[in-house]
């Protein structure tokens, strides 16, 4: 028999929650903190490059910043921020009461978070990793890489476990938890792209985990996988890394495409043009994304045949991506467009991403890549993809879903000011870096001489970074201001949108839907507005709702993995104050002990009685939500 829900303090409630909505907000906060941290590093690096031969940062500090900036932005900022929206929105969009495995959802967050903390601890033990975010061997070997590389390896290994189990959870949720009538071809595009992105995580993070394990064995136990003098192969690391690294771009950009595919139809007052083509284009992009990893290695010496095959495969990705671009444009064509902040970010994404794609096709030409490789042209290209593609989409999604997540609107005036300051700053920063690359400025250098003609463009690029920073500060001000003065949202659907999450009350109750909705079409809420009375028809009567109990075990298990990783890092420390094996084995014992407790403990959750659900429904009807 299920127990009654226990009353908890606020902190205990958040530490033990398995509610997908609260976990989403924790992902949002953690991802934002890491985003700001990596952004400050970027600002410091641009200040160092503002003038020739600056001494704002030393070469060593610059190397550490450039490594941590890339690593944090991809693993600990972009990924969790997308996971925040995936966690909050997917169950609501498919008509589910939670994800398939709420306990695993909480575990995925806490493992990611403590993995990020483990990586960040490197600053207190001699400095961060300094081999670049790709950690190419031999730069990351024991001979050249300091203790920071051990934090990189173990921090990403722990964090990656959290990402992997969360992806499995999303896959099972989307396959098994859909409301009656919601076939796969009625899924919102955001759910489709998240589903395909989670599949990519499944296949991309496993080689990363294997590669990090081999590098760990090289560094901690003197294995020889990547040491040429002992029969190892440094190019092997490059292949292992990039067969993860290139799909990682699509792991991030596909859910971003999904956000754009939700925002543009909502504010164009039209259904998404070419839904079926968009679904299959997403599948093709994901498939081809695994076929092109070696285009990062054109200058390694794979030979003309391999280079040619990967060059052609890379250019082919432009075709399904082009389909998506035109479908977004056709969605806006003839629509009654509302240019609020979310729509400004979504529509500006399109030309920005196209420019990033065009430079991508240029880089795909293997002979020309010999000129571009390791120059600022490449830096400009991938920032147009990651900032112009992923970050603009995240901001669009934030302004779009913020009322549903927090119960109040963000200020539109501050929002539009944020958009223009950030967007102008972005192009100022990165457009001129194409030109710096064509002029021959190499990546990852901490200074340059005054007679090389690079002064003006570097100065402009740094000014742009100040604009971007000012934009992010405006966003923070907006969030704080709106929390106190923002317009409160009391209706379910402030945007007159099309999908199921806008059929839930605001704020969303812990059980999401009092009655599981019956889905009759793609864009189910819009269908009911046209063919019904504007409300979703229930697929079941009002009954007791079963809910999972919260648990502190995910938090404790993650602490155990944190200490296990730290204990292994201590093996490379000089004179550790405690035997590293005690820390490592103790951490693993804590994690496996929690797994054992979880296995033998009977926990059937609790029920929300039908009477309470009916009372909630009556209250909502009275309030007009």
Curated annotation (Swiss-Prot):
Reactions catalysed, semicolon-separated, are: 4 Fe(II)-[cytochrome c] + O2 + 8 H(+)(in) = 4 Fe(III)-[cytochrome c] + 2 H2O + 4 H(+)(out)
EC supergroup of this enzyme: translocase
Membrane topology classification = Multi-pass membrane protein
| PROSITE patterns attached to this UniProt entry | COX1 (PS50855), COX1_CUB (PS00077)
According to the record, the signal peptide region is none
Q: What EC number(s) does its UniProt record assign?
A: 7.1.1.9
Write out the annotated subcellular location.
Cell membrane
Return the InterPro entries for the record. Cyt_c_oxase-like_su1_dom, Cyt_c_oxase-like_su1_sf, Cyt_C_Oxase_1, Cyt_c_Oxase_su1_BS, Cyt_c_oxidase_su1_bac
Cystine residue pairs? none
Task: State where heme a3 binds.
Answer: 381
Q: Where is this cross-link: 1'-histidyl-3'-tyrosine (His-Tyr)?
A: 246-250
Keywords, alphabetical: Cell membrane, Copper, Electron transport, Heme, Iron, Membrane, Metal-binding, Respiratory chain, Translocase, Transmembrane, Transmembrane helix, Transport
Which GO molecular function, any one, fits this protein according to its record?
Answer: cytochrome-c oxidase activity
According to the record, what induces this protein's expression?
Elevated expression at high pH.
Q: Name one GO biological process term.
A: oxidative phosphorylation
Supply the SUPFAM superfamilies for this chain: Cytochrome c oxidase subunit I-like
Q: Outline what the protein does.
A: Cytochrome c oxidase is the component of the respiratory chain that catalyzes the reduction of oxygen to water. Subunits 1-3 form the functional core of the enzyme complex. CO I is the catalytic subunit of the enzyme. Electrons originating in cytochrome c are transferred via the copper A center of subunit 2 and heme A of subunit 1 to the bimetallic center formed by heme A3 and copper B.
Q: Which family does it belong to?
A: Belongs to the heme-copper respiratory oxidase family.
The name this protein goes by in its record: Cytochrome c oxidase subunit 1
Name of the gene encoding the protein in the UniProt record: ctaD
């Amino acid at each position: 028999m299920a127990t009654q829900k226990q009353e908890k303090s606020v902190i205990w409630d958040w530490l033990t929650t398995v509610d997908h909505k609260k976990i989403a907000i924790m992902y949002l906060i953690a991802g934002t903190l890491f985003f700001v941290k990596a952004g400050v590093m970027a600002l410091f690096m641009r200040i160092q490059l503002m003038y020739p031969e600056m001494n704002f940062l030393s070469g060593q500090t610059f190397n550490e910043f450039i490594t941590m900036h890339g690593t944090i932005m991809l693993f600990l900022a972009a990924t969790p921020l997308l996971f925040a929206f995936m966690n909050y929105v997917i169950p609501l969009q498919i008509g589910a009461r939670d994800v398939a495995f709420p306990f695993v959802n909480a575990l995925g967050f806490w493992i990611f978070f403590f993995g990020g903390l483990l990586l960040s601890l490197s600053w207190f033990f001699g400095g961060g990793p300094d081999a670049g975010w790709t950690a190419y061997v031999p730069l990351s070997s024991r001979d050249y890489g300091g203790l920071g590389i051990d934090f990189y390896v173990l921090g990403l290994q722990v964090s990656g476990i959290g990402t992997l189990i969360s992806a499995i959870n999303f896959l099972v949720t989307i396959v098994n938890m859909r409301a009656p009538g919601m076939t796969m071809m009625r899924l919102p595009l955001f759910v489709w792209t998240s589903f395909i992105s989670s599949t990519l995580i499944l296949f991309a993070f496993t080689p990363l985990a294997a590669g990090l394990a081999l590098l760990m064995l090289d560094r901690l136990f003197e294995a020889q996988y990547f040491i040429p003098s002992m029969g190892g192969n440094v190019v092997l690391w490059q292949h292992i890394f990039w067969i993860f690294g290139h799909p990682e771009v699509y792991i991030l950009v596909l859910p971003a495409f999904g956000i754009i595919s939700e925002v543009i139809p909502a504010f164009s007052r039209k259904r998404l043009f070419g839904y079926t083509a968009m679904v299959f284009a997403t599948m093709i992009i994901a498939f081809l994304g695994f076929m092109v990893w070696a285009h990062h290695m054109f200058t390694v010496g794979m030979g003309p045949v391999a280079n040619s095959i990967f060059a052609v495969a890379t250019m082919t990705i432009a075709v399904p991506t082009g389909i998506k671009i035109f479908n977004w444009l056709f969605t806006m064509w003839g629509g009654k467009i509302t240019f609020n902040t979310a729509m400004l970010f979504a529509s500006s994404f399109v030309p920005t991403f196209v420019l990033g794609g065009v430079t991508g096709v240029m880089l795909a030409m293997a002979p020309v890549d010999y000129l571009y490789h390791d120059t600022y042209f490449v830096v400009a290209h991938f920032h147009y993809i990651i900032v112009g593609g992923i970050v603009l989409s995240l901001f669009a999604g934030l302004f779009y879903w913020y009322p549903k997540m927090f119960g109040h609107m963000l200020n539109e005036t501050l929002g539009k000011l944020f958009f223009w300051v950030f967007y102008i700053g972005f192009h100022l920063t990165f457009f001129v870096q194409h030109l710096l690359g064509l002029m021959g400025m190499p990546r990852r250098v901490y200074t340059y001489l005054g007679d090389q003609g690079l002064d003006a463009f570097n100065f402009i690029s740094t000014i742009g970074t100040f604009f971007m920073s000012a934009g992010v500060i405006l966003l923070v001000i907006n969030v704080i201001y709106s929390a106190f003065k923002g317009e409160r949202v009391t209706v379910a659907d402030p945007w007159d949108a099309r999908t199921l999450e806008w059929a839930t009350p605001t704020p969303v109750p812990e059980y999401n839907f009092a009655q599981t909705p019956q889905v009759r079409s793609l864009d189910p809420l819009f269908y009911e507005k046209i063919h019904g009375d504007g409300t979703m028809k229930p697929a079941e009567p009002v009954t007791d709702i079963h809910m999972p109990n919260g648990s502190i075990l995910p938090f404790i298990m993650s602490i155990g993995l944190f200490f296990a990783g730290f204990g292994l890092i201590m093996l490379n420390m000089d004179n550790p104050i405690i035997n590293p094996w005690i820390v490592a084995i103790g951490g693993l014992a804590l994690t496996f002990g929690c797994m054992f407790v979880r296995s033998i403990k009977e926990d059937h959750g609790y029920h929300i009685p039908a009477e309470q659900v009916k009372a909630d429904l009556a209250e909502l009807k009275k309030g007009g939500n």
